[in-house]
């Protein structure tokens, strides 16, 4: 990886993971509404605490560059599943746009899974020890 790519990799990790950090925190403050929305879409609401934990912890892990391949794989699958489960009404332009956004983010996480966290990451420090 070239020098500029080493410096820019953390910015990419922040940009791709930030949405999950914010959404995980927002799910806490809107817990009842999110649980109901999940239930109405056929997803058991008892999964919500796990989703919140994984969104917040996974986002922080990617931002810090820790276990990036593992959490990128999780978010890759998560983005595809949420697109299919919650945004499958293509007659609704908003659902269609969110579906495509989720699929695009899945592509970004797949790329991160393939290439790793980069030089400025906790994963990189672990490999030096």
Give residue spans per PLM region.
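Extended, low-polarity transmembrane helix blocks
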Residues: 1-29, 36, 45-53, 57, ...
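Flexible, solvent-exposed coil segments and beta strand-coil junctions
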Residues: 40-41
